[in-house]
Amino acid sequence: MATPPHEPDNQDHDPDIEDGAAAVEEAAQLLQSWTHGDLRFDDNIVSCKFVRTDEGRLVAAVMVAALHTADTVLMIPDEHAPVLELLLTMEPFDENGPDGRWVDRWRIYHGEEDDINWVFLDIDMGRMSGIIIDGDALMVANVLAQEEAGLCRAINELGTTALQRLCRNRLDKDVEAPLVVGVDPGGLDVRAKFDVLRIPFPMPMELPEDIVRITKDWAAPAKG
């Protein structure tokens, strides 16, 4: 009697696929937690501050020389993880046109820009730990985009003292004048004096009321 063909079940798995999926998730989370990196083009390496659009595209102000090269790489360093390298395509835009709101977002995060050439940075490909990652998998849309402004306002209304406790409790940092400037399911972006800090959530959160609740808990005075 012939042995019937093996039917795959939920316990079957492909280690290569699992490793690839884990690498994509790790890279996406790493990128989400940073708002600056090193931009490499031709023989230049310059600091690059960026923000994300609602659809997950990156936005930055770059020097004019960066616009005239076909090989542009953004490197996201992290002391606790491998470097993430992103191969980019730049798309210039006019800050006085319909996309000017992303310039406003950039300035809320970073202040005044050093360069005046505004571009979208589309990710063609990523690489981390030797694994190649499709760029589309790294441009993650913010499902809280419509609620983001209201969430920032609600959290900032807790007051400076509460936000200082939040940063101290979650990041072990003393921040003089913290301000929440961004919210997505992965965490909060908090502007400090010289940097933008990331306060991650313990798990992805998509309900605004849950985000406000957990933030209030983190920012509450110590009991007793």
Label for each model-derived stretch:
Residues 1-224:
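Binding-site signature for planar aromatic cofactors or substrates
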